[in-house]
């Protein structure tokens, strides 16, 4: 067996070697000192192995009647939804293991990918998930992949098909990740399938269950299959090639949204390396679509890889090339001027979604879909060669027009008001967190502060006032996942200096670690983990795990202080930036600046989807983690 994978198995599967108390022999490489340390750190759960530190050694473990401690697996009090969430939160790896396995994935990509996919296929076999299903739409990307999936789902649902949508992360509730026909699944369905999967996986894997992200992926696949969903749309978690969602050998169609720099510790430091990881979702003979905004370094990789695996690639057209019927036939059509999701950047995502939906429709055998594609234009499209062009699908189907208009996606260019609790306050939320997405978010914010109006509520009427010097502008920002806040903040400060946007009367950096222990653990783990590792362990995670990944932080007492330092350095302290103990307190500060509703306030919340989710939770007055 390959030593790298054996080391990986030792780290995550120590209890399996003790099963039935039989002796075993293992071979480890020169980096086995890490395994020694890992065992010592976890001596409450594992018997210590007497590894040596020579370059290569063979060790036989002693026979003993000791078994793994019972705390290796969560013991639920009941089979409720709340206990399902509690159990789910234990399926996360400690930081030491995450860092080690992240390095293995980066340094040994081919072997790691084979191992991860084989492991995922085994999990699916245990849960009787049919991987030969072909009704899958699979989408990767750096920016806009979630929005693309949401628009695609909306279009297909408007045509009358049942849909299953799996996305990540969630904003408030883990149920958001799994949606049927546009609605997140109920607590009853969540708990039913969670415990069903739990029992089946424990039977085959004892305490070695899939980690947080993988478990939810498996749950989603099981639900969509057993509920007989006609179309499944899967958003990649991180990358593509090694992602848990990449387990289907023959999806119906795949897509890659705009690419940029994110998760470099896993995917690589160049755009070409990142693009190659994303291209890993391409399959032989399966159409692949991407957007025209890809930079040359990225698109060249996508083209080369599509030719290599014989996955026909098509670059989607600009959305303004499509027309929609105005009721007078093909000779009386209109351009698409706007869609349900705000921000001009969503138009590119919409064009990608249109192509994915059209391809999915074309490949169906249902009678009503065949009747849809009965025109000579539609018949010209061949998904085997993916000769996609606008003329084949113009004017667009009515379902596509409705799907574009009716799509909603929380936390992305979202305008929120709650006059009863926050009078005269407008909240603008966008989960942008990369350098590229910060520029897109900024363009959206410019359109708001320069052309829109602010809502003013009185005791009797609601009117609108044009933006003026009396409007207070507030920024609530934080950065997670070890990302450099300076990169994100730079275009914002430059726009202020260039007088393209108003100065922020106050910028607030809240601590986004929720005070409740269950929320706190969730936020820390999601920030440092996502789906980086494969198998879970219940070793406790340090409270400061998420903030100790950047050496620069050591100069500041907290991560929030560090972000303030970055902000002050960029702005030369020309406008105030402060920290807040919590998201709740940052909202209260904003409310106080409005003089409790007597002044108009516009609040921009950005930098992290976790921050956006926390703010939405406060604004919606949902105090419990549900």
UniProtKB/Swiss-Prot annotation:
Q: What GO CC annotations are associated with the protein?
A: cytoplasm; cytosol; mitochondrion
- EC nos: 6.3.2.17
Which pathway does it take part in?
A: Cofactor biosynthesis; tetrahydrofolylpolyglutamate biosynthesis
Reactions catalysed, as given in the entry: (6S)-5,6,7,8-tetrahydrofolyl-(gamma-L-Glu)(n) + L-glutamate + ATP = (6S)-5,6,7,8-tetrahydrofolyl-(gamma-L-Glu)(n+1) + ADP + phosphate + H(+)
Q: Which residues are listed for ATP binding in this entry? A: 144-147, 412, 430
Single GO molecular function: ATP binding
Keyword annotations for this protein, in alphabetical order, are: ATP-binding, Ligase, Magnesium, Metal-binding, Nucleotide-binding, One-carbon metabolism
| Gene Ontology biological process terms from the UniProt entry | one-carbon metabolic process; tetrahydrofolylpolyglutamate biosynthetic process
Q: Which PROSITE patterns match?
A: FOLYLPOLYGLU_SYNT_1
In which residues is Mg(2+) 1 bound? 168, 235
> Per its UniProt record, what SUPFAM superfamilies does this chain match?
MurD-like peptide ligases, catalytic domain, MurD-like peptide ligases, peptide-binding domain
Q: What does this protein do?
A: Conversion of folates to polyglutamate derivatives.
As for family, the record states: Belongs to the folylpolyglutamate synthase family.
Q: What protein does this entry describe?
A: Putative folylpolyglutamate synthase
Look up and give the organism this protein is from: Dictyostelium discoideum
Gene that encodes it = folC
């Amino acid at each position: 067996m390959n030593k790298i994978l054996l080391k990986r198995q030792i780290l995550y599967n120590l209890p399996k070697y003790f099963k039935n108390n039989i002796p075993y022999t293992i071979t480890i490489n020169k980096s086995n000192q890490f395994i020694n340390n890992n065992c010592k750190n976890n001596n409450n759960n594992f018997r210590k192995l007497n590894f040596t530190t020579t370059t290569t050694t063979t060790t036989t473990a002693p026979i003993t009647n000791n078994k793994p401690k019972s705390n290796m697996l969560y013991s639920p009090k009941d089979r409720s939804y709340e206990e399902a969430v509690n159990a789910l939160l234990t399926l996360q790896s400690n930081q030491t293991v995450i860092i080690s396995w992240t390095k293995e994935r980066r340094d040994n990509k081919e072997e790691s990918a084979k191992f991860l996919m084989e492991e995922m296929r085994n999990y699916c076999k245990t849960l009787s998930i049919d991987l030969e299903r072909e009704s899958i739409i699979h989408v990767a990307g750096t920016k806009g992949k979630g929005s693309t999936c949401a628009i695609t789902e909306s279009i297909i649902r408007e045509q009358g098909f049942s849909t299953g949508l799996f996305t990540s992360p969630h904003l408030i509730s883990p149920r958001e990740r799994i949606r049927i026909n546009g609605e997140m699944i109920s607590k009853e369905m969540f708990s039913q399938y969670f415990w069903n999967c739990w029992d089946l996986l424990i039977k085959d894997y004892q305490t070695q269950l899939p980690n947080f992200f993988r478990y939810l992926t498996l749950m989603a696949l099981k639900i969509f299959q057993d509920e007989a969903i006609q179309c499944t749309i899967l958003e990649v978690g991180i990358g593509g090639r090694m992602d848990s969602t990449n387990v289907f050998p023959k999806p119906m169609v795949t897509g890659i949204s705009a690419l940029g720099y994110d998760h470099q510790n896993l995917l690589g430091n160049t755009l070409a390396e990142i693009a190659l990881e994303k291209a890993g979702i391409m399959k032989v003979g399966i159409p692949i679509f991407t957007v025209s905004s890809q930079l040359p370094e990225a698109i060249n990789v996508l083209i080369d890889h599509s030719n290599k695996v014989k996955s026909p690639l098509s670059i989607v057209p600009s959305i303004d090339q499509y027309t929609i019927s105005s009721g007078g036939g093909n000779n009386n059509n209109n351009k698409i001027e706007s869609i349900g999701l705000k921000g001009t950047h969503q138009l590119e995502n919409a064009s990608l979604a249109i192509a994915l939906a059209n391809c999915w429709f074309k490949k169906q055998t249902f009678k009503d879909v065949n009747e849809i594609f009965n025109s000579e234009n539609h018949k010209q499209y061949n998904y085997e060669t993916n000769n996609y062009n606008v003329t084949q699908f113009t004017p667009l189907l009515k379902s596509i027009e409705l799907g574009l208009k009716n799509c909603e996606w929380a936390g992305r260019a979202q305008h929120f008001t709650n006059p009863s609790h926050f009078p005269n306050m407008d909240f603008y939320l966008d989960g942008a967190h990369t350098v590229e997405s910060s520029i897109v978010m900024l363009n959206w914010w410019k359109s708001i502060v320069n052309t829109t109006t602010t809502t003013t509520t009185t005791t009797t009427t609601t009117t609108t006032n044009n933006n003026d010097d009396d409007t207070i502008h507030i920024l609530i920002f934080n950065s997670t996942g070890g990302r450099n806040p300076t990169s994100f903040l730079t275009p914002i400060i430059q726009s202020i200096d260039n007088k393209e946007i108003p100065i922020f009367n106050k910028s607030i950096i809240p601590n986004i670690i929720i005070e409740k222990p269950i929320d706190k653990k969730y936020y820390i783990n999601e920030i440092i983990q996502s789906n980086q590792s494969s198998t879970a362990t219940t070793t406790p995670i340090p409270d400061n795990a998420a903030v100790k990944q950047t050496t620069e932080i050591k100069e500041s007492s907290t991560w929030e202080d560090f972000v303030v330092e970055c902000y002050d350095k960029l702005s030369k302290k020309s406008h105030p930036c402060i920290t807040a103990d919590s998201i709740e307190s940052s909202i209260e500060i904003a409310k106080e600046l409005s003089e409790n509703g007597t002044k108009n306030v516009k609040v921009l919340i950005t930098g992290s989807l976790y921050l956006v989710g926390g703010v939405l939770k406060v604004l919606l007055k949902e105090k419990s983690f549900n």
